[in-house]
Design a protein with these regions (language model features):
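Glycine/threonine-rich beta-strand-loop-alpha-helix active-site module
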Residues: 74-177
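ATP/NTP phosphate-donor binding region
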Residues: 1-90, 345
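Active-site pocket-lining segment
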Residues: 287-346
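Short glycine/serine/threonine-rich phosphate/pyrophosphate-binding segments
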Residues: 18-21, 43-46, 73-74, 98-103, ...
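C-terminal charged capping/lid subdomain of soluble metabolic enzymes
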Residues: 323-390
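Glycine-rich phosphate/pyrophosphate-binding beta-alpha loops
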Residues: 140, 261-294, 368-369
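Carboxylate- and glycine-rich phosphate/diphosphate-binding segment that chelates Mg2+/Mn2+
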Residues: 148-270
Length: 390
């Protein structure tokens, strides 16, 4: 046995940890670029809460709030230009995976020259970036736990990760208390993304003992708590009776949030596999929500690949009270149903005419995902799988 495990991220987990933002930021300078989406962090009051703490500590700040879902490389460049012009010492991200990923691109390009796409496709390398602090407001992408920033090139539709240790956050403030403003549909999609991260890392070719232990634990947490938490949030949003009592709700938020962060950590080392490799072209082409795309793709991929590593897939199936790995795809479909997620690509606007582009783009942005998948995958296999998903 031989492996290495390296993940230099300071995770600060706990209720109301966000109130310590100034203390976490102080070692990195006196001026921050705050990266958010257009409305959510402001409507929830979290942005004002963070700003008040920074003001009290005399840490200056400037706002960049132009990030949308499936963030673009061009948006990251706009943010980097602002960080440069304002002489910011650090970047603070407040938001979900799109915000954190874009903030990583901003922090990176604020100190590096050239075309960001050259770095994404490894034509150029650098291990420098502004210090990054993240406050995740959704529990799904796990971006707080790794050195990946997924960005889409608007000219080509290529959706691929910027990857380097420099964009691993210096501090990740993982506060379950700030998750509660998520609408039900957001919780469903990000929660399923977290589940896929852990499943793919656990079954990847580059899995190792540390990632196996973490990912298996995270899948256990999500199997127990994700659907009940979603049903509770949905009931409250619809003005119905609560599903969980206060103690159960606290435990559920902690568990799903923790599992999400673990998912980000394990993919930093063990990577993701074909499920993510096939979803990125889909959301690059149609701008669909990542977790919604995975809800269609992951069950089909699991059914196609499980027999290449039955021991691992059998272990996962048992978590969901299914007999063996051949039933894991069906277990995932039941979760998709319970989360009210989409079950086919047709409902997301795809047709047979899109399949050639999707297949080609897998080989542009996701050859590493194919190589990391335990089953041997061909171009014809990917075409067959996309057709099954329509």
């Amino acid at each position: 046995m031989e492996f290495s495990y390296f993940l230099p991220v300071n995770i600060q987990f706990g209720w109301n940890k966000v109130d310590n933002i100034a203390g976490f930021a102080a070692p990195y300078g006196k001026k921050a670029l705050i990266v958010t989406g257009r409305t959510s962090a402001k409507k929830s009051g979290l942005y004002d809460r963070v700003v008040a703490k920074l003001d009290a500590a005399h840490i200056e700040h400037v706002l960049f709030d132009q990030v949308d879902a499936n963030p673009l490389t061009t948006t990251a460049l706009d943010g980097a230009a602002l960080a440069k012009s304002e002489s910011c010492d650090m970047v603070i991200a407040i938001g979900g995976g799109s915000i954190m990923d874009c903030a990583k691109g901003i922090a990176f390009m604020a100190v590096n020259d050239g075309d960001i796409n050259d770095y994404i496709f490894n034509r150029k390398t650098s291990d420098n970036a502004l210090p990054l602090i993240v406050i995740p407001t959704t529990c799904g992408t796990g971006s707080e736990g790794n050195g990946f920033g997924v960005l889409t090139n608007p000219e080509t539709g290529d959706k691929k990760s910027l990857r380097c240790n420099a964009i691993v956050p210096k501090v990740s403030i993982v506060d379950p208390a700030v998750m509660g403003t998520m609408p039900p549909h957001v919780l469903a999609s990000v929660g399923f993304d977290a589940l896929c991260h852990n499943i793919e890392a656990y079954t990847s070719k580059t899995a190792q003992p540390f990632t196996d232990a973490l990912a298996h634990y995270a899948v256990t947490l999500l199997a127990q708590y994700l659907v009940p938490l979603y049903k509770h949030v949905k009931a409250i949003a619809n003005g119905q009776e609560a599903v969980l009592n206060k103690k159960q709700l606290t435990k559920a938020w902690e568990s799903v949030t923790l599992a999400s962060t673990i998912g980000g950590m394990v993919i930093n080392t063990a990577g993701v596999t074909l499920g993510h490799g096939m979803e990125h072209p889909a959301s690059g082409l149609k701008d669909i929500t990542h977790g919604v795309g995975l809800a269609v793709i992951e069950p089909v991929v699991v059914e196609y690949t499980w027999s290449a590593n039955p021991e691992k897939f059998n272990s996962l199936a048992r978590i969901f009270n299914h007999g063996d790995g051949s039933e894991l795809g069906e277990a995932l479909r039941l979760i998709v149903h319970d989360l009210d997620l989409t079950t086919n690509l047709t409902e997301l606007g795809f047709t047979k005419k899109d399949i050639p582009w999707l297949v080609d783009n897998v080989y542009v942005v996701a050859t590493g995902n194919i190589a990391n998948t335990v089953a041997k995958i061909s171009r014809d296999d990917i075409e067959v799988l996309y057709k099954k998903m329509l």
